[in-house]
Swiss-Prot record:
Keywords: Cell inner membrane, Cell membrane, Membrane, Transmembrane, Transmembrane helix. It comes from the Bacteria. It is found in: Cell inner membrane. This is UPF0060 membrane protein Reut_B3679. It comes from Cupriavidus pinatubonensis (strain JMP 134 / LMG 1197) (Cupriavidus necator (strain JMP 134)). SUPFAM superfamilies: Multidrug resistance efflux transporter EmrE (SSF103481).
């Protein structure tokens, strides 16, 4: 699996693992949503271990992908259209991620 796909899958696992307990705590969903939420967070932790680079660099670069996926989640799941400020923030985060990922080695 390529690095970007791994980052995307990791971000979805983390967001889903946090969103499901939110549904239980704030939206009155059944406590059963905590089980897939816990599994999703376990998957997130395991996926982080698959990243091929130094962990600090991986977490820093992954942060840019997480921000992008979170704004996409805002739009697709929460039904809130991202503002120009949201999109600018994603662009800045992706720029920072690109500096970290594509640095000369």
């Amino acid at each position: 699996m390529n690095t970007i796909a791994l980052y995307l899958l990791t971000a979805v696992a983390e967001i889903l693992g946090c969103y499901l307990p939110y549904l239980w705590l704030r939206q009155g969903a059944s406590a059963w949503v905590l089980l897939p939420g816990a599994l999703s967070l376990a998957l997130f932790a395991w996926l982080l271990s698959l990243h091929p680079d130094a962990s600090g660099r991986v977490y820093a670069a992954y942060g840019g992908v997480y921000i992008g996926v979170a704004v996409l989640w805002l739009w697709l799941v929460d039904g809130v259209r991202p503002s120009a400020w949201d999109l600018a923030g994603v662009g800045v985060a992706f720029g920072g991620m690109a500096i970290i990922v594509f640095q000369p080695r």
